[in-house]
Amino acid sequence: MRLREPLLSGSAAMPGASLQRACRLLVAVCALHLGVTLVYYLAGRDLSRLPQLVGVSTPLQGGSNSAAAIGQSSGELRTGGARPPPPLGASSQPRPGGDSSPVVDSGPGPASNLTSVPVPHTTALSLPACPEESPLLVGPMLIEFNMPVDLELVAKQNPNVKMGGRYAPRDCVSPHKVAIIIPFRNRQEHLKYWLYYLHPVLQRQQLDYGIYVINQAGDTIFNRAKLLNVGFQEALKDYDYTCFVFSDVDLIPMNDHNAYRCFSQPRHISVAMDKFGFSLPYVQYFGGVSALSKQQFLTINGFPNNYWGWGGEDDDIFNRLVFRGMSISRPNAVVGRCRMIRHSRDKKNEPNPQRFDRIAHTKETMLSDGLNSLTYQVLDVQRYPLYTQITVDIGTPS
């Protein structure tokens, strides 16, 4: 019998070769799937980072270092030729608690302040927390008031301060979200000096801060404490501030270790003014510059609204704090030194003849005179490169 010849190459061998190619393809697909899964895992399950990990350019990267496109590590998105979003806190809607006028963002300033906006808050979470004591502090400073101040130049010297006077550290997350409230009327030259000196100090202190100048409209008698209440209410409409520094416009610290932030107890900052021979005039003194946390401020029902004219409201505030079981913390007299810009008494800010009687009744009046009785009307909001000015009608003495 003739034996059948074994199968040689030809059509009968094709099924084995096809199977081999199919197996190779399956292995390649599995390897690709495993690679994509690994990259996805390394990206922290954030698909937006996949192009960076695999070396593909994105519109923000532009084929170069991504830090340059997002303002290095500043947490600010440079928008290039695109029309920028509104500055921080800007809105075309009426401001709550005010009139129907829209919020207006205007004022001169460098273009860099107009073409950059903060990145989403989630980006800041990747930054480390700022240290308890800033390494940028320099200590004692020479404070002089004998040179003119140009606010456009001040803005250029502080390029990281954003429209409306907002700033946050570039390379760490500050635990101190501070609104600085300045009661104001007809003190433009003093405000220039304040902005010139304080913006660098506040940045070296690594604060997340905003500057609010609360301008009393009209020529009725001045009411400092009521303007501070207004500043508290209005600042919270912009940002989740947790600390409030209340500062007269004519006081400048002489040492940047004097922290413009809040502590476990209410803080008196201007403890050694040149006006008083660099000493505390009396133990209960709480005037000039002070800081209260949001909770501390709410606990005392804010500040009194019925102190029209000069004097008395600081002592009323001190009484409120004591009646709520709080004590005053202060820096030492060396760190707490401040200089006052000399000036004559403002018109419509004469001494309040009722102040001593009102101070004597703080315990009875603090429950009904404060945030819960505050009335005012916002007339205008202007956001300048170095500060936000809110002009308000706070009424007249009843």
Swiss-Prot record:
The chain crosses the membrane at residues 25-44. One of its GO terms (cellular component) is basolateral plasma membrane. Residues 45-398 are lumenal. It is an enzyme of class 2 (transferase). It catalyses: D-glucose + UDP-alpha-D-galactose = lactose + UDP + H(+); an N-acetyl-beta-D-glucosaminyl derivative + UDP-alpha-D-galactose = a beta-D-galactosyl-(1->4)-N-acetyl-beta-D-glucosaminyl derivative + UDP + H(+); N-acetyl-D-glucosamine + UDP-alpha-D-galactose = beta-D-galactosyl-(1->4)-N-acetyl-D-glucosamine + UDP + H(+); a beta-D-GlcNAc-(1->3)-beta-D-Gal-(1->4)-beta-D-Glc-(1<->1)-Cer(d18:1(4E)) + UDP-alpha-D-galactose = a neolactoside nLc4Cer(d18:1(4E)) + UDP + H(+). Pathway: Protein modification; protein glycosylation. GO terms for biological process: acute inflammatory response; angiogenesis involved in wound healing; binding of sperm to zona pellucida; cell adhesion; development of secondary sexual characteristics; epithelial cell development; epithelial cell proliferation; extracellular matrix organization. Keywords: Cell membrane, Cell projection, Congenital disorder of glycosylation, Disease variant, Disulfide bond, Glycoprotein, Glycosyltransferase, Golgi apparatus, Lipid metabolism, Manganese, Membrane, Metal-binding, Secreted, Signal-anchor, Transferase, Transmembrane, Transmembrane helix. It holds the Pfam family Glyco_transf_7N. Its cofactor is Mn(2+). The soluble form derives from the membrane forms by proteolytic processing. Residues 61-117 are annotated as: Disordered. Changing residue 352 to S: Protective factor against coronary artery disease; strongly correlated with low plasma LDL-cholesterol and fibrinogen levels; decreased UDP-galactosyltransferase activity. N-acetyl-D-glucosamine binds at residues 312-315, 355. Residues 1-24 are cytoplasmic. Belongs to the glycosyltransferase 7 family. Homodimer; and heterodimer with alpha-lactalbumin to form lactose synthase. Interacts (via N-terminal cytoplasmic domain) with UBE2Q1 (via N-terminus); the interaction is direct. This is Beta-1,4-galactosyltransferase 1.
